[in-house]
Amino acid sequence: MQVKVNLENNTSYNVYINELEKLNFDTKVVILTNELVAKLHLDTLLEKIQAKELFIIKIKDGEEYKNLQTIEYILNQMCAYKLDRKSLLISFGGGVISDMGGFVASIYQRGIEFINIPTTLLACVDASVGGKTGVNNKFGKNLIGTFYQPKAVYCESRFLKTLPSRELAAGMAEFIKMAVVFDETILSFLENLNEDKFLNAKLDDITLAQIIQKSIELKASVVSQDEKESGLRMLLNYGHTFAHVIENQTGYKKYLHGEAVAIGMNMANVLALNLGLLSEQECQRVQNLLAKFKLPISYKISNTHEFYNAFFLDKKTHFQKINFILACGLGKACIKNDISKEDILRTLEVFA
């Protein structure tokens, strides 16, 4: 099963679903992974790879390590291994690894090729596809980064079988995001999906592959039309404006990214409801679906004005205008940058 991401300037690539066979490289290869993934799956991957020379860099697991300090460590290791411009980097892990691996590949010797092999559902359905790379700093999430496309992406169901239910649910949040923004029919599919099988990693490979394929097809279509996020691609940030503030305020430790996105989607829906863009029934339907997959939908805001001011560090804020991605009915979304401060604060007060 393959999905093509069509891009200009000879940067198109394929996403392969359950098609990882032998990978042979006539160059030096470095695998970037974390300690947990290495323990669970690295031996399986190593059986698939042949290279002129093969190196492994392991980092600690967690969003709190997605920073410039870790990037410097990775770059120093790559220099020590004498990797050159013809070398290849393989990002083998979740969204944090794919974000950092892509960023490192984009800046090491001004750019080397890289491949994503995601090991979380969230990375399969979202983070590993599209070319967004980056790290966090004390001011916010992904404020330092590049657009840099992978050479290929390999999504394998076998690597998802060891995921705890919380990680699977976090990935589902990004799929629900796609449904609300682009395709209402997915909501019905998910409402009929057996959540117990899904959350216990017992969903059959065919259904799991269908979820991954559908999400990637939607994202590939968007990225093909708007690679650098100048318009249409911004819709993929539905829920993220709120989520990034939540993640930053909690030090990237309390919530997985998908969990923060779930809360952010609910907050965005409350704002859309208050503006008359979304009905109460539609808002409730999304809430119910998030709850079905054991995702959080609420966050206690201690200071609404502080939360509001954090929006101005969001990458979608232009000329001091906050661009909110809101559902305008289910299956479609819109960008709103003319919402009054009063309306925004009124929504934040619901969660205070």
From Swiss-Prot:
Locate the residues binding NAD(+): 61-66, 95-99, 119-120, 132, 141, 159-162
Q: Kindly list the cofactors needed.
A: Co(2+); Zn(2+); NAD(+)
Q: Which residues bind Zn(2+)?
A: 174, 240, 257
Going by the entry's taxonomy, the superkingdom of the source organism is recorded as Bacteria
Q: Where in the cell is it found?
A: Cytoplasm
The GO annotation for biological process reads: amino acid biosynthetic process; aromatic amino acid family biosynthetic process; chorismate biosynthetic process
Give the HAMAP family listed for this entry. DHQ_synthase (MF_00110)
What name has this protein been given in UniProt? 3-dehydroquinate synthase
